[in-house]
A protein has these predicted regions:
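Glyoxalase I/VOC metalloenzyme domain signal
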Residues: 2-55, 66, 73-115
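A short beta-turn/loop motif at secondary-structure boundaries
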Residues: 62-64
């Protein structure tokens, strides 16, 4: 989903396995999970948040994009996780595609697969 320049991700964890989405949102519940910020210094941002007492929850690479990310559990203070995401042209292209698809959306077919 998109609201102006803000992308809104609606995430529904499936399966039984533990994951970062269920760490703060119990199964069967609906809640706000995270805010995401672009960063040019992922390691530095992680180190800064960890030095403030926050726990690193997950790291990874967005498939096919070259972008790396981290989730830091800031929920004890902020009430939600914080995602840090490095910039890449491919990930920017994905976000631009989502924004463009939202411009003339008529409200039908809200659940769609990407790719």
């Amino acid at each position: 989903a998109q609201a102006g320049d803000m992308q809104i991700e609606l995430i529904e964890p499936t399966g039984e396995q533990a994951n970062i989405y269920r760490d703060t949102v119990p199964e069967g519940k609906t809640a706000f999970h995270h805010l995401c910020y672009w960063t040019d210094d992922l390691d530095g941002e992680i180190a800064s948040l960890v030095s403030q007492g926050y726990e690193l929850a997950a790291t990874g690479t967005v498939a096919g994009s070259g972008a790396t990310f981290a989730y830091v559990d800031t929920s004890p203070v902020l009430g939600h996780m914080t995602e840090l995401l490095t910039y890449s042209d491919d990930i920017k292209g994905l976000f631009d595609m989502v924004a463009a698809a939202s411009i003339n959306w008529d409200g039908n077919d809200p659940k769609r697969q990407l790719g």
